[in-house]
Amino acid sequence: TFEYDGWFGHKALPEFARSRTDLAAPVREYVFDITRRWMDPDGDGDPADGIDGWRLDVAYCVPHGFWRKWRRLVKSINPEAYLTAEIVNRADEYLKGDEFDAVMNYMWLYPTLNFFAPNVKAPSVREFRRCQNELLKAYPEEALYVLQNLLDSHDVGRIASMLENVREPIAEFQKYFEFSRVHGRPEFVTTRPGPAAYQALRQ
């Protein structure tokens, strides 16, 4: 039997062969072929019949060198294509104009959740603004207009549930992800969120 290294230990998801800077050539070309198929299905050079963008899951698990080559391919097919990536921490390295146009902006989410969650000792308005301004300065201006500023996602609890249940500040994805897993958390309120959570949403 074959035994593969699995992505994050998931044996059903074998890891691609790669170097420090790129995916192995056969894997890279396979992904490139998929990209061409979806962006220009009939291969006539007109992308009007193809998709207009990509959202890449766990993009931080793939080398930067691959994303740079992939971006060049995508933009050669459709210069207007939108490329966004799941990056759960600071994304400066991905938003230099040679990889992605935008990211899922979890770094915006953490201070926002902490500020509005009724059961968390909220940071001051000054601290909240400092966190947001730090991000505004870190990313290129053109990226700021297309970032995905999200309050929840398919990977974590919905915002009303998080507002109801969060009791301490959250500043990084692993803690946020683990917190939203109900199993083993008898204190996690799984019924309809109470009025305090909805009041926070209305703010």
What are these regions (language model features)?
Residues 1, 81, 192-196:
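Intrinsic structural disorder
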Residues 1-47, 70, 76, 93, ...:
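Substrate-binding/active-site clefts of carbohydrate-active enzymes
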Residues 9-29, 51-62, 113-125, 159, ...:
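The substrate-binding groove and active-site-proximal loops of carbohydrate-active enzymes
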Residues 43, 59, 88, 155, ...:
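Flexible loop residues that form catalytic
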Residues 133-203:
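Active-site-proximal substrate-binding groove within the catalytic cores of carbohydrate-active enzymes
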